[in-house]
Amino acid sequence: EFDLIVGHGTTLEHWELTIKFYLGIGDTTQTNAWFGPNPTDRLDLKLQRLLSHQMTLATTLAGQTLLKSQFGASNAEVKGIVKGRLFHPYSAWLDQQWQYPETIAADHLRGWWLTVDDFICRFNNGSPRFRPLTKRDWLSELQAVPVDERLPADRCLAALSSSREHYAHHVAMLDDNGLETSRGFVVMAPWLEVTQAQDQTV
C-alpha cells in the first residue's frame, strides 16, 4: 500500500516515508555496516526494498488502477523520504570522526553506541547521568529530566534489565541540569553476535 499520496499543484506525488535508527559497526562507509537495534534490520536491505518495491508501487497495475479511481491520474512522481539517526561507535562519535555512506546526508542526526561492558567501564564514576528511553521517546529530544530519573550508568542498566529487549537499549546522556546532551544505544552480546555473523556472510 502507498504511504502517502500528495497533490502538488497539477502533479500527483507518491511519497514513501520511513524513520529508521541504525548503528554502525566495521567499515561504516558501507551501507551493509549499519544495523538496527534489532540487528536483522540492515540499512542496505532497507534501501533495496524501498527502491525495488515500495517506490515502484505506482507502476504496478493495482497501483495505477487505484490512482486512476481515487485521484483521476494513472501516474505519480515518486519520492522516498528517509529520516532517523545514525549511531556511531562511541570513540568515533566522541572524536567527531564520523564515517558513513556517501548516500547519507552530511547533516544527519548522530548518536553513539557502546557495549554493556564498555558503558559501565567508561561511566563507572557516576557521571554523567542517563535516562532510559522508551519507544515514544525516540523521535524527540527530552525536556529537563527530574532529579530522581537521572541515573548513573549502573542504575540505568539495572532499570533496563527488566525490559524484554535483548539486543540493545536506548538511553539519553544528561548534563547536570537534567538536559539531554546526546543519546545512544547500549548493545548486548546477542546484538554483537548477530551483526558479526551477518558481516561474515556479506
What are these regions (language model features)?
Residues 1-202:
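Intrinsically disordered, low-complexity Ser/Thr/Pro/Gly-rich regulatory segments
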